[in-house]
From Swiss-Prot:
Subcellular locations according to the entry: Nucleus; Nucleus, Nucleoplasm; Nucleus envelope; Nucleus inner membrane
Annotated GO MF terms: DNA binding; molecular adaptor activity
Region annotation Required for association with mitotic chromosomes: where it falls in the sequence: 566-778
Region Required for chromosome segregation, nuclear growth, nucleoplasmic accumulation and cell cycle timing, but not required for nuclear envelope and kinetochore localization, residue ranges: 1630-1784
Biased composition (Basic and acidic residues): 1126-1149, 1279-1293, 1337-1351, 1367-1382, 1428-1444
Tissue specificity of this protein: Ubiquitously expressed (at protein level).
UniProt keywords, alphabetically: Cell cycle, Cell division, Centromere, Chromosome, DNA-binding, Kinetochore, Meiosis, Membrane, Mitosis, mRNA transport, Nuclear pore complex, Nucleus, Protein transport, Translocation, Transport
Biased composition (Low complexity): 1297-1306, 1533-1546
DNA-binding region location: 1630-1642, 1746-1758
Name of the protein in its database record: Protein mel-28
Length: 1784
């Protein structure tokens, strides 16, 4: 054929059925191709039925008639019909140009004429818009929502003609259809010329929106294309001069000319609609012919509807706006062959639903709207073939067919690009426009169509191993029925997707490509067959390089394509080809096996949730992986089998067997999932166990066993150490879980017959326990079993299933013979009660035939024969019972000489007659069964004793250096659920067994190499089993209780976490103890041996020497009191110690009152620097000669205090130092263990000294005395702090408390604990409602905390709005309480206002201490803190126990600074000069005065909340902000401004916080003045400027009004109104380019709204006065200074407006008056709103300005003045008209 070399077009069949001049594939109104092809052969019209594959009907026109065009025109009954445009120069039918409608009679090959109509001009194209079937019923016509005059027609067709004529027509029915004479009706009233509105005389005026136009002679323009946009009912008319007319057939009755972008012929127009477009756009593609300078081109046009406007559904599609989205020139394209939409059905179920307005209509030919998918179009064109170097360049050029598919959905996914671009790969594909190459010659090709009537006509390439973008290109689509209509034949072809094309090429040329894969690998990746980011070519993204494997990445990419896409035959041929070396074959086998094993683990990863009971069904991705794995395993198995035969390698044969095991496992797993065997049903599993137990007991009674029991025993002998046994004895293993059952299929040591019998029996038991129907016949069981296992799975068939059922029946059936023998045996003797003895046998009570079985008789005969023959043959030793029976057998056969002396002596007769035979052999007496049983029991007793001794030892041991030695596992965390040797949370039970394998097996398990598998090894089966087994991390059984506890509930409180490998005894002891054991004490009086191991000394548990703790990783040892110690232990303490310590507390308080230290916080030391008065501490140090005692002795941790979390880096150094100190002390004396335990919580009643119960050391008592001192001091401080305040005590439950260690030798620890205690002291004070100045400090707190994170819109607005309402509703009592000076014992803690104290906690529950607060929690607490205090009393506030984060701590420090300053200013007369202010954020050795630069830096970074109240300032201002309006701020605003500037500090790398002691009020005032001066000198930042602008009294709506005034919209002015009887009516004269319009009385004047044209509609009649009243009146010529705005909807519905309210032709003067009036109104509204804003600003702050908007908004007056200046400048500028659309 002519397309044999084509790679995309695949020819199926050709039909040489005719010779013709033109072929047309019929399409319905929306472009769906139908299975009919029309052929024009001179004056004969033929119809080829594709389904019948022959010409079925024809019609012969009169001689000399020329057939122009044809279209689909069904009858009212839905029968096939066509519409034909005919030219008859002889006028044999009475007309030269006419249109006929032909209908098909199923019983006759001839067609009949049903309708006809004469046309005035020569026909060029015909198009059926709405057929008789579409409009047969009145209800159907109503659904179409057409113009009311068109609704009366039986059908609507469009006829394009020469001389610029396009008609909407209704054909006239023929009275006698069967008449041989053609009757052509001439009814001009049924013809409506759409182009008359734009034709004046013999000139076509193509006018655009901007009023520019071009004139063309009508004789040179004709209609070249017709198409219907179904959603908006718009007819698109393509003109030969490049223009396009859009005529709306809906009730809007409007026409418009689209933008003229070229002057070339519009060949075809194809409507498109994207899938589920929310914007309701409608698209169409217009194909443009070539010119001498340009190739052919496509244009993508978009029609926009009024979806964003509030209009009715019927008006939504009125007057759409069209624009070009994409233009693309097809290089070397010569002419268009076919442009056909690809229309498919979205869902067949949607065809039955009732269609509404969106669907337009419902009939046999059209499915508008949601049922049809019209997102693609086929573009077929002729292209000049490229000349190859070997061809003759002077030869005639050859033209071939080339096609492209445009997908608008893919264009959407690429974010509607404006040009066609490639993806940058080797194939150079476009994401939404795919080119199809072919070698089909284009000389006689007339049309190409794609049928999509059946579901299999269109398919997309799918891949289970790749999700590349190329798989969603149009090139990934395959079309099965593509018909190419030629002049001489019809070819049925297939368009194949590019992926299949590349796969076929790789398969055919695989032997050559495997040696040179560089080029093809890049093509494979460019087609998306594998992912680009996988260099190794594996789709699992986990395939590592195999050791000593020489395969390149390009070869792996090629092999992946062959293996994963199922090219089995081509891949297996490589094993038998002689041109491929054996080395390469082995490497390919190793690679294939590696891919199979790796993909098996991928499948296990996706099924693990189902096996573990965490999900009930597989995901779609997992289902695809299972299906792909089954195919992959078959390909690999076939290659390994072929390669083993070619290379004669047994190892490869064994590996092939392992691959088939993986395939059986995967396939059976899929079947179990499909039949709901997986996931496990616990109830059904229990039923299976009960059924098996019942059957086993029945078989035991029958002295037999079940067949499945023998199968399990054989499995145990073949694979005793397999992981599927799950440490269960084999006789109790059945029925297993599905996981264990399927796992045995992966074991290559077990034969296939055993696997088959086991699986079949399991499936039978599962079916038998069905809750729906438990009674099944044997046939039903067999059929259901074969249905689940599928035929040939493990070579199973119905015959083998029946055999297994029969064997099970026999085991459960009891025979009469066996019952009799059993009864006789029980009568003679019972093995359970007595044993066999010589006395019973000599008594003749038991005959030998009953006592000795047949098998034993045969064995005894052989033994007797061997014994009688004599010689050196050594007889085997029998067990005692068999020996007795054998002696009886010899006695019965009278072989007395062979009997033993024991048997002879037991028989009186024999001992009398044969006394010499008693001691003839020197063998001693053998042990009886009783003796052996006693010996075994004694051994077991001793073994149990040793085991019990081992169990008394500690459960968790420290790690040992020898890793190969295995220690006894710990039972603390369950049997096999977890292990102490793994860092992960869960280690499967088989992990330890896996670790026992050698390095070769470990390398296989770790995906590192499989060379060890193919190497010679005696344990090959074990290694293969290890390789293909389910990974241990997925081998976890289903546990419902564990799943509920882990997945839906909180973890158990007494469940300790798993412990990793321990490297010290201390960690072992901490991790191993349970949560309910309480405090552990060890006696030190028992010494530990030097060489004793931990196992030997483990049971003592009394002597642990902690001096051996030298590990650097030891945790910090801290003090913790036990809750279990009650008050009865506390009362035993002596009162003398309590009194002494109270005196020490008072002395220490007096010393601390004289000296104030600066202490560390948990922040970095460089973050904060606090000014303090150091004269008093220095004097105290000088007098005493020593430093001030640490503050930790004075302050103690309270149970209701909030403890901040410590920094990890800081604590790591602290732990190391503490450990070092304890080690040094341990050399001299024993100390307490210091283990801090999370389950021991200290209560309030535990605050006194607690004696040690089990240890009497003096050292430990000393350490507890220190604790008692701390407790007493804490109680003293708490009582002193609460005495001056007359508030109620907080009633709370005792809260847990963690006692911090007391190590006075370490300075860092001093600061750590003192900082904690200071924080607690400040939080102990009762809440004080802030005054105005303190309110400002709270604002500063909010600002500082808020600035720690990027501000969001919510925090910026809410924080400012809420801060203004915190001073409202103040109680006078609270104000008086604020002015009360704090007492001495409070130590100025009442000044600080913590955000955590202001929060209320209704429940008083203890939150988690270890979880730091999130950012949202911190921000929300800061924003709401000020407003929550408003209506609450101090005694109602309850402290919250969540520890503050780092941001909260820094914010509290900042708030303390601001609060201290405000108190200093307001309480100067009442404050004592000796008061000291405690610092919370400065280290002991850091005291610095901030310079001016630091102050400037601090004030520069002000927060948004602060910058809002700061307006533009003058250098003389005293710090108060003044808005632009001149309004004086209120006192609260002024105070807020000044205090905010004084206290506004932010956190940076080295931020400085000023803290002034009480005697330095003058210094503080000077400092505040310096800050104000520094702030005035620096330039205003963006936030400051925006805040000052925001305070102006400008209504925000005024700027919007002004912008609306400036914005004008043009009215589309090229829609025409046409009279229904408009044959002789002339068109209005339109002014030429650049000239004003002539004022003619006969022609309507063009208004400024239309910009040079009159509004045009399809219909205009004198009878329709209401329709004409909707069009605007005669207006003046257009001026570009229009400012009024009229929408299309206002023009269309203008009849609803009263005549006296209409404004005719508003001139420039009137427009100015209107604008002035509007501006006055807007100014008045602005003033009224501004005045209300002024009143409101006294109560609340202005909204925070948004980031980046620093420019002040203009007022309405300024906007109006600017608009006037712009209009004057525009009026002075001349109007430039162009054929192209004006750029707005």
């Amino acid at each position: 054929m002519d397309n044999e070399n084509s790679s995309i077009f695949k020819s199926y069949q050709g039909y040489e059925c005719w010779r013709g001049e033109k072929q047309i594939i019929l399409k319905d109104s929306i472009g769906r191709q139908l299975p009919y092809i029309v052929n024009f052969k001179k004056n004969t019209c033929q119809i080829f039925d594709i389904e019948w594959e022959r010409v079925t009907h024809s019609f012969v026109f009169p001689e000399g008639c020329a057939l122009i065009d044809a279209d689909y025109f069904p009858t009212e009954e839905g029968k096939l019909g066509i519409l034909v445009g005919v030219e008859d120069p002889r006028q044999s039918c009475g007309a030269e140009h006419f249109v006929l409608a032909l209908a098909v009679d199923p019983d006759s090959p001839a067609m009949t004429i049903t309708h006809s109509l004469e046309v005035p001009s020569k026909i060029t194209v015909v198009k059926t818009l709405f057929s008789s079937a579409d409009m047969a019923d009145e209800t159907q016509r109503t659904v179409l929502k057409l113009y009311h005059r068109l609704m009366t027609w039986q059908h609507i067709v469009a006829i394009g003609c020469k001389e610029t004529q396009c008609y909407l027509a209704r054909l006239v029915a023929v009275e006698t259809p069967s008449s041989p004479v053609i009757t052509v009706h001439s009814e001009k009233k049924y013809l409506i010329n759409l182009m008359n509105a734009y034709v004046s005389g013999s000139v076509l005026q193509y006018t655009l929106d901007d009023g520019a136009y071009r004139e063309y002679p009508t004789a040179a323009v004709y209609i070249s294309a017709l198409s219907l946009m179904p959603r908006s009912r718009t007819l698109l008319v393509g003109l030969s001069m490049g223009g396009i007319l859009a005529a709306s057939l809906n009730p809007s009755n409007q026409m418009m000319l689209l933008e003229l972008r070229h002057e070339r012929l519009v060949r075809k127009i194809a409507p498109l609609e994207p899938e589920d477009d929310p914007d309701k756009f409608e698209y169409f593609i217009a194909t443009v012919d070539c010119s001498p300078r340009h190739p052919i081109m496509i244009q993508l046009w978009r029609g926009s509807f009024k979806t964003l406007e509030d209009v009715d559904g019927e008006e939504k599609y009125d007057r759409p706006s069209f624009s070009v989205c994409l233009e693309h020139k097809i290089l070397f394209g010569e002419r268009w062959l076919a442009v056909n939409p690809i229309v498919t059905e979205r869902d067949h179920m949607m065809l039955t639903r009732k269609r509404g307005t969106e669907d337009s209509m419902h009939n046999v030919s059209q499915t508008f709207g949601s049922t049809s998918n019209r997102n693609s179009v086929l573009l077929a064109y002729e292209r000049k073939k490229m000349v190859i170097g070997t061809e003759d360049p002077n030869a005639e050029p050859e033209y071939i067919v080339e096609a492209a598919i445009f997908d608008i959905d893919s264009w959407y996914y690429k974010r509607v690009p404006g040009r066609v671009s490639t993806d940058g790969t080797v194939l150079k594909q476009c994401a939404f426009l795919s080119t199809i190459k072919s070698n089909i010659r284009s000389e006689d090709v007339n049309d190409i169509g794609i049928l999509t009537n059946e579901a299999t006509d269109v398919s997309s390439f799918s891949s289970m191993v790749s999700d590349a973008d190329q798989l969603f290109y149009p090139s990934a689509l395959s079309f099965e029925r593509v018909f190419v209509a030629k002049n001489t034949r019809i070819d049925w072809m297939k368009i194949q997707n590019i992926q299949d094309t590349i796969l076929n090429k790789c398969a055919v040329k695989l032997p050559a490509l495997i040696r040179n894969p560089e080029m093809i690998s890049s093509v494979v990746m460019a087609a998306g067959l594998v992912r680009k980011n996988i260099l190794s070519g594996s789709p699992n993204s986990s395939a590592a390089e195999i050791n000593e494997l020489q395969l390149s990445s390009d070869q792996k990419v090629l092999l992946n394509v062959i293996v994963y896409y199922g090219k089995i035959e081509e891949f297996c041929q490589l094993a038998s080809r002689p041109d491929i070396s054996d080395t390469l074959k082995r490497e390919l086998a190793e690679w294939a096996l590696h891919e199979a094993v790796d993909y098996k683990r991928t499948i296990s990863d996706k099924m693990v949730s189902l096996f573990q009971g965490r999900s009930l069904a597989l995901s779609p991705l997992a289902e695809e992986s299972i299906a792909q794995g089954i195919k992959l395993f078959r390909v690999v198995y076939e290659y390994l089998k072929a390669c083993s035969k070619a290379l004669k390698d047994d190892r490869l044969r064994n590996l092939a067997h392992s691959v088939i095991c993986m395939r059986n496992h995967t396939k059976l797993t899929s079947q179990f999932i499909n039949f709901a065997i997986i996931p496990v049903d616990p109830i059904r599993q229990q039923r299976m166990k009960d059924l098996h137990s019942k059957r086993k007991n029945m078989a035991r009674k029958n002295s037999s066993s079940l067949p499945v029991q023998s199968v399990v025993r054989k499995m145990n002998r073949q694979a005793p150490n397999a992981q599927f046994w799950n440490d269960i004895p084999h006789d109790e293993w059945y029925p297993p879980t599905p996981l264990d059952l399927l796992e045995c299929l992966l074991n290559v040591s077990i034969s296939e017959s055993i696997k088959r019998e086991l699986v079949v029996q399991y499936v039978i038991d599962w079916i038998s326990t069905s809750p729906e129907d438990s009674e099944h016949s044997e046939k039903q069981l067999a059929l259901e079993t074969i249905k689940i296992m599928t035929n040939q799975m493990l070579n199973v068939n119905l015959e083998k299933i029946y055999y297994i059922l029969d064997q099970g029946k026999k085991a459960l059936t009891s025979s009469k013979t066996s019952d009799d023998m059993r009864a006789l045996g029980e009568k003679v003797f019972s093995m359970k009660d007595d044993e066999i003895s010589y006395e019973k046998l000599w008594g003749k009570d038991a005959p030998m035939t009953v006592t000795i079985g047949k098998h034993d008789l045969q064995r005894f005969e052989q033994r007797m024969k061997m014994q009688m023959e004599g010689g050196k043959v050594r007889l085997p030793v029998l067990d005692p019972e068999s020996e007795i029976l054998y002696q009886m057998f010899l006695f019965e056969n009278e072989k007395f000489e062979a009997m033993s002396s024991e048997a002879i002596s037991s028989n009186k007769l024999l001992s009398a007659f044969l006394p010499g035979m008693i001691k003839k052999d020197g063998r001693g007496r053998q042990k009886t069964a009783k003796e052996q049983e006693i010996e075994i029991s004694v051994k077991k007793m001793f073994e149990r004793k040793v085991q019990n001794d081992d169990e008394d030892m500690p459960e968790v041991f420290a790690s040992v250096n020898d890793k190969t030695e295995r220690k006894r596992k710990s039972s603390q965390f369950g049997e096999d659920d977890e292990s102490s040797v793994s860092s992960s949370q869960y280690v499967p039970p088989t992990a330890k067994r896996i670790q026992q394998w050698k390095s070769a097996v470990e390398s296989v398990a770790n995906n590192s190499s499989i060379n060890s598998i193919t190497s010679p090894d005696s344990h090959q089966n074990a290694e293969i089993n290890m390789m293909i087994a389910t990974p241990a991390r997925y081998y976890k059984r289903h546990n419902e209780e564990e799943n509920v506890q882990d997945g839906f509930l909180s973890p158990a409180g007494n469940r300790p976490p798993p412990v990793s490998a321990h490297n010290s005894i201390l960690k072992t002891a901490k991790g191993g103890q349970s949560a309910s054991r309480g405090r552990i004490r060890f006696r030190a009086d028992v010494p530990r041996g030097a060489d004793e191991s931990i196992e030997d000394n483990g049971r003592k548990g009394l002597a642990l020497n902690f001096a051996i703790l030298e590990d650097e990783e030891e945790e910090t040892m801290t003090i913790r009191k036990s809750r279990s110690m009650g008050k009865h232990d506390e009362e035993k303490d002596s009162e003398k110690n309590v009194v002494d310590e109270m005196e020490e507390v008072k002395d220490q308080e007096q010393e601390n009152d004289e000296c104030i230290e600066s202490e560390k916080t948990f922040e970095n030391q460089d973050d904060f620097e606090v000014l303090e008065d150091t004269s008093a501490p220095e004097a105290a140090n000088t007098e005493n000669g020593s430093e001030t005692p640490p503050m930790e002795d004075t302050f103690e941790v309270r149970d209701d205090d909030v403890m901040p979390p410590t920094d990890e880096t800081y604590l790591s150094h602290l732990q190391t130092d503490k450990t070092g100190i304890l080690e040094e002390e341990g050399e001299d004396e024993d100390i307490w263990d210091g283990v801090q335990r999370s389950f021991e919580v200290q209560m309030d009643e535990d605050c006194e000294a607690v004696p040690t119960i089990d240890v009497a050391d003096d050292l430990e008592s000393k350490s507890e005395e220190v604790n008692e001192e701390e407790v007493v001091e804490s109680e003293e401080v708490q009582q002193d702090a609460k005495e001056p305040e007359k508030t109620e005590k907080r009633q709370e439950e005792p809260e847990p408390e963690v006692m911090q260690p007391v190590i006075p030798e370490e300075p860092q620890n001093e600061s750590l604990e003192s900082s904690i205690k200071l924080q607690e002291e400040l939080q102990e004070e009762p809440d004080i409602v802030p005054t105005g100045d303190e309110d400002t400090a709270d604002k500063v707190q909010e600002q500082a905390v808020e600035e720690d994170r990027p501000p969001s819109r919510n925090t910026r607005s809410s924080s400012v709005q809420k801060s203004t309402s915190q001073v409202e509703d103040r109680d006078p009592k609270e104000l008086v309480e604020e002015e009360r000076p704090p007492s001495r014992n409070t130590r100025s803690a009442s000044v600080q206002k913590s955000s955590n104290q202001e929060k209320t906690s209704e429940s008083g529950e203890v939150t988690e201490e270890d979880r730091p607060p999130s950012r949202n929690t911190r921000s929300a607490s800061v924003q709401k803190s000020s407003s929550k205090v408003k209506d609450q009393k101090p005694e109602e506030l309850i402290e919250e126990d969540r520890p503050p984060s780092r941001n909260t701590r820094s914010a509290s420090a900042q708030k303390t600074v601001a609060a201290n300053k405000s108190v200093l200013e307001s309480e100067i007369p009442s404050r004592s000069a000796s008061r000291r202010t405690r610092s919370t954020s400065l280290r002991n050795d850091t005291v610095a005065e901030p310079d001016e630069t630091s102050v400037a830096m601090t004030t520069r970074r002000r927060t948004r909340a602060t910058s809002e109240v700061v307006s533009k300032q003058s250098s003389e201002d005293d710090g108060r902000s003044t808005p632009k309006t001149g309004r004086t701020p209120t006192k609260k605003a002024a105070a807020s401004t000044s205090s905010s500037r004084a206290g506004s500090v932010t956190r940076g790398k080295k931020s400085i916080i000023q803290k002034m002691p009480s005697p330095l009020e003058v210094t503080m005032e000077v400092q505040e003045e310096e800050e104000e001066e520094a702030e005035e000198e620096r330039p205003a930042s963006r936030s400051t400027r925006s805040a000052s602008v925001k305070n102006t009294t400008v209504d925000p709506s005024s700027s919007a009004l002004a912008s609306t005034k400036r914005t004008t919209s043009r009215k589309r002015g090229n829609s025409e109104t046409i009279d229904f009887n408009q044959d002789d009516k002339s068109a209005p004269t339109t002014p030429k380019r650049g000239r004003p319009a002539k004022k003619d009385a006969g022609s309507p004047k063009v208004g400024s709204k239309a910009r040079g044209t009159k509004p045009k509609s399809i219909f205009e009649n004198q009878e329709d006065e209401e329709d004409r009243s909707s069009s605007p009146d005669i207006e003046q010529p257009a001026t570009p200074t229009r400012s009024s705005k009229r929408t299309a909807r206002s023009r269309a519905n203008s009849e609803s407006i009263d005549d006296d309210s209409k404004q005719k032709t508003p001139k420039k003067k009137n427009a100015a008056v209107n604008e002035a009036g509007t501006s006055k109104q807007s100014r008045s509204v602005t003033r009224s709103r501004a005045s209300s804003i002024d009143v409101q600003q006294e109560v609340e702050e202005p909204t925070t300005p948004k980031r980046g908007r620093g420019r002040p908004p203009k007022t309405v007056l300024e906007n109006i003045e600017e608009g006037e200046e712009e209009r004057k400048e525009t009026a002075a500028t001349p109007l430039l008209r162009s054929a192209r659309r004006a750029k707005q």
